[in-house]
Every structure is written in C-alpha cells, then in structure tokens.
C-alpha cells in the first residue's frame, strides 16, 4: 500500500509539526508515504489524482481503528490519498470525489490537530498490518 497525505497548509503549531514529522518518520518503516502540503483546498484533488481518496470531513463516517484497517486492506496494492482541508474545510468538489468521507471525531478539530490525529491513526493501522504490538484492541 502506498499512502499519500495531502494537507492544506504546513502545521505552524510546534506540537503538531513535530508530531506529524515523527509519525511520518515511523510510518515510512512500514509503507511508502508521501506527505504533501498545498496552499488552497482547490489544489488537493490534483495532488490525489490516480489515488483512492479519503476525505477528512466532520460529516463523514466514524470508523474504529480496526474498521479503518479493514477498509485499507480492501485497497491493498492501490495508492490511497488522505485529504485534510484547511480552517475552512473542503470545497464541495473535493467531497464529491471522495471514495470515503471519514470523520475522526464528532467534535470539530482544529485542522493541524486533525492532521496529527490522522497521522497517528495511519501509523497505528500500519503497525496493526505488520503485526507490531503498538495497537492493543
């Protein structure tokens, strides 16, 4: 599985920036990862061309870690892009192109925090896939 995370804006908050960098480093041990930052939401779709598109959206489906893991197993061998909007969320065109609209929480999360939570969950899924004991159900 080849993962791409495309986010509007680089994290400016120190904790988010350091956390995203740390999880990206860890994830690359388990799967190829591209971490791409764009300036505007309209730039997300071109960066995800040729990928399955998982769009983070507060109106999306709430999945457990195990459900996300199983969904990604279905897409094994494919390229999967996770699209993280900015402070204004996603343009409608991005939501319409989603293979999966995913909500990380029923709470509204600041977009940098949402990116960090996504990175941790992707790392968790990859370790689960590899049989590593990081994830404990």
Swiss-Prot record:
General function of this protein: Specifically methylates the pseudouridine at position 1915 (m3Psi1915) in 23S rRNA.
HAMAP family linked: 23SrRNA_methyltr_H
EC number(s) from the headed UniProt entry: 2.1.1.177
Keyword annotations from UniProtKB, A to Z: Cytoplasm, Methyltransferase, rRNA processing, S-adenosyl-L-methionine, Transferase
Residues given in the record as S-adenosyl-L-methionine binding sites: 56, 85, 104-109
Transferase among keywords: yes
Pfam families in UniProt: SPOUT_MTase
Subunit composition and interactions: Homodimer.
Name of the coding gene: rlmH
The name this protein goes by in its record: Ribosomal RNA large subunit methyltransferase H
Provenance organism: Thermus thermophilus (strain ATCC BAA-163 / DSM 7039 / HB27)
Molecular function via GO: rRNA (pseudouridine-N3-)-methyltransferase activity
